[in-house]
Amino acid sequence: MVSKQQTMGFQTEVKQMLHLVVHSLYSNKEIFLRELISNASDALDKLRFLALSNGSLFENDSDLKISIQINEKLQTITISDNGIGLSWEEAVENLGTIAKSGTKEFISQLTGEQAKDSQLIGQFGVGFYSAFIVADKVTVKSRRAGLQPEDGIVWESKGDGEFTIGYEKKSTRGTEITLHLKPENDEFLSDWRIRGIISKYSDHICWPIVMKKLSEEGKESKEFETVNKATALWTLQKSEISEEDYKQLYKHISHDYMDPLTWSHNHVEGKHEYITLLYIPAHAPFDLWQHEAKHGLKLYVKRVFIMDEATQFLPRYLRFVKGIVDASDLPLNISREILQDNKQVESIRAACTKRVLSMLEKMATNDKETYQKFWNEFGLVLKEGPIEDFANKEAIAKLLRFSTTASGSEKQEVSLEEYVSRMKEGQDKIYYITASSYNAAKNSPHLEIFRKKGIEVLLLSDKVDEWLVGYMNEFAGKKLQSISKGKVELGDDETSEQIKEQEKTLEPLIKHIKSVLNERVKDVLLTNRLTDSPACVVADEQDMGLEMQRILQAAGQQVPVSKPIFEINPDHALIKRLHDIQDDNQFELWVTMLFEQAVLAEGGQLDNPADFVNRVNRLLVSS
């Protein structure tokens, strides 16, 4: 008998999610069972964990399992567990809302294309809502462990925007979900069909999944039998686990629909005993860049589930890695706070980090195509590595990929090792340029002398690149050198001597230009880096780079006041023309225009663009 029944509306995001699930995932209907079994498994994990400190939660029933029953007459499938269960408040919160951060942003990414959307929804994890792919009504009966039988609840919805919830006496703890199947989904009333789905997706679940036994004639008996392997897969030796088993376990722990790119499974013995199973996903999760989103590994202690998203076992730049740590020596009552200062955790973290970097190095060496797929998804995150992880800086540096002037493509596919192997004879530096975009970097006037001499330059246009080169200042004994900061020394003594001679000759012109630009520049110098452009702006060796200044200003940060150096090309026709201008106003117009042109060529912004346009127009008229 249901009492105190109420009708409530779903959260807006849930309505959208239900619509998307039903319409985008209908071609892979069977995943509903995987999702509901996965939820039941989580409920059993949580009960066992909480019962460590409160044994009464077992209520004299510690035989934990998941049960699946089919009723052909009523056209229903019931998935039940004797796990932690739900209270009234938890049912409303967990079944009526989506508590995940970034839900709105996620939904805004959906395109209406079924193939793309099903992949996105898969990586978001639809969980309970997948029931509505096959059912036109879902009934949930549940009672949280430790509450009275009278506190049992019954929740029901047709997936049409609202649900009812009320109290109903339930003598046993746990959750029972009954799916009232749509007529076209009667295939799921077949015992063998359900067993096949369990074998395909949920064989690795470490809790027993039981169904009624079948007689030789195919009839149900009253006895139940376990229909999955019911072992903690990661505790087995590699030789006992198939590739398909590894992939299905990954999908279970990650809620991802795609196979992982690779994985590493290790049993460590010695002073500390633990098992790690680490996966590299094939695509980035939708919340990879959301700072509040948690990314971590599942932690078990002696096969007992302790927590999801334990962030202490990998540095943040490896937050895309999914997997399991099962430690034998950590206390069962360990908390997130204790994990922070635990020596064994530090040891496992160091080992996991090296394991992931080793996996990636192996992939980069043996399967360049797959590694490029990885880089396209996670390269930006990996670039955070040298900034965060000094100890592994060299290993990470080998994994980085860049666009260069030699590759001729925006695709980042050149390693630093490849760059070094192609260096010119006598070249002792790795040259790079940072800019706000690939096109800005590729077309920078700073590249002119390097193109002429055939010297390769890294083209860095990701925001993180500015920080990266600040922390990673050399590779393989070669210093990383910005071509837009300080002087460029290319070992050309003849050019250096020529510049010195020209400086003496052009000293009056340089002084005149300085007097015009005055406070806008730190200095005016002759350049040896330009062949085609009249001028460029560079940062002083000791100053913050111009692109870094722009990034910090855009973020609202205070930036130390630093002025650029204005370098002029004495061989360019426009600079030669300055010699002949007698009128001070005309001279000022030309110099200011050349300076502002150089700022724009470097991707900079002008305080007054209208003034620049007027200046150019006046010069065009007077030419």
UniProtKB/Swiss-Prot annotation:
Q: Which Pfam families match?
A: HATPase_c_3, HSP90
| Region listing for A, in residue ranges | 1-336
Keywords recorded for this protein, A-Z? ATP-binding, Chaperone, Cytoplasm, Nucleotide-binding, Stress response
List every stretch annotated B: 337-550
Q: Where in the cell is it found?
A: Cytoplasm
Ranges for region C = 551-623
Alphabetical list of Gene3D superfamilies matching this protein = 3.30.230.80, 3.40.50.11260, Heat shock protein 90, C-terminal domain, Histidine kinase-like ATPase, C-terminal domain
- In the UniProt record, does the keyword RNA-binding occur? no
One CC-aspect GO term: cytoplasm
GO molecular-function term, one example from the UniProt record: ATP-dependent protein folding chaperone
* Main localization category: cytoplasm
HAMAP family named among the record's database cross-references: HSP90
Q: How does it assemble?
A: Homodimer.
Entry-linked PANTHER family = HEAT SHOCK PROTEIN 90 FAMILY MEMBER (PTHR11528)
Q: What does this protein do?
A: Molecular chaperone. Has ATPase activity.
Name the family the entry cites.
Belongs to the heat shock protein 90 family.
What is the protein name stated in its UniProt record?
Chaperone protein HtpG
This chain's source organism reads Legionella pneumophila subsp. pneumophila (strain Philadelphia 1 / ATCC 33152 / DSM 7513)
